[in-house]
């Protein structure tokens, strides 16, 4: 799901498609006082489990790693693991989600990002830390949801607003989006793999992103 776009309704649709777990943003305006470091359940279909991104710890790597004005620079693997294991990071599962472009584009090779990532697994798996890695399925199976997550409005990990205005923030992409999806039944009626292929590519989020003015 692009940029972790999620809402109660989207989660219910995903559950109806047969999925049992979904990734979403641990947005403050949705979580409130709750921690992203637990498994949650969809508000409409509680069979769908949710793993929420710890945006602070994720962005420490994705955006702040090479920022020399950051008061925690330089970030080493040992320092980062101390944060993961700290009492100030309570919970059962810490989800670190970031774009692939973090590695090599946002954080170029000369920042030391690749050396950091090579050192991180060994530091995490040190016995004294009592931590382990888990796949999405493993984490969702191991831990029970602590509560339902209510998210009536669509959220994402994009920008400060944590919404979808990065793609649907003005009349131009909004109109393009509406007209595109208005063709759904017509495209389906054609029963043409070629048209299906083209229509699916027209749904690429970047088309709408580059119409944005924010």
Specify the residue positions occupied by each region the protein language model found.
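Active-site glycine- and acidic-residue-rich loops that bind
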Residues: 74
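Short acidic/polar capping segments at secondary-structure boundaries
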Residues: 3-5, 27-28, 56-58
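A generic short-segment signal for beta-strand/edge and adjacent turn/coil regions
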Residues: 18-22, 65, 101-102
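Acidic, His- and aromatic-enriched active-site or binding-groove loops in soluble protein domains
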Residues: 11-52
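A conserved hydrophobic secondary-structure block that centers on an alpha-helix together
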Residues: 1-11
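Active-site/ligand-binding-proximal alpha/beta "capping" segment
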Residues: 77
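Active-site and substrate-binding clefts of carbohydrate-active enzymes
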Residues: 37-48, 52-55, 60, 67-70, ...
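Conserved beta-strand positions
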Residues: 1-2, 23-24, 98
């Amino acid at each position: 799901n692009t940029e972790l776009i999620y809402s109660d309704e989207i989660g219910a649709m995903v559950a109806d498609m047969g999925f049992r777990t979904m990734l979403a943003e641990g947005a403050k305006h949705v979580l409130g006082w709750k921690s992203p470091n637990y498994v949650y359940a969809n508000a409409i279909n509680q069979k769908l489990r949710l793993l929420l991104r710890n945006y602070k710890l994720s962005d420490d790597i994705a955006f702040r790693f090479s920022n020399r004005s950051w008061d925690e620079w330089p970030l080493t693997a040992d320092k980062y693991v101390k944060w993961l294991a700290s009492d100030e990071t309570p919970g059962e599962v810490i989800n670190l989600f970031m774009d692939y472009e973090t590695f090599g584009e946002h954080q170029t090779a000369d920042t030391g990002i690749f050396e950091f990532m090579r050192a991180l697994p060994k530091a995490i798996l040190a016995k004294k830390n009592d931590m382990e890695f888990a796949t999405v399925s493993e984490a969702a199976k191991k831990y029970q949801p602590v509560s339902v997550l209510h998210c009536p409005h669509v959220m994402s990990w994009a920008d400060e607003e944590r919404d979808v205005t990065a793609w649907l923030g003005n009349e131009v992409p909004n109109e393009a989006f509406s007209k595109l999806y208005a063709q759904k039944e017509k495209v389906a009626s054609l029963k043409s793999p070629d048209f299906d292929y083209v229509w699916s590519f027209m749904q690429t989020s970047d088309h709408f992103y580059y119409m944005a003015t924010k």
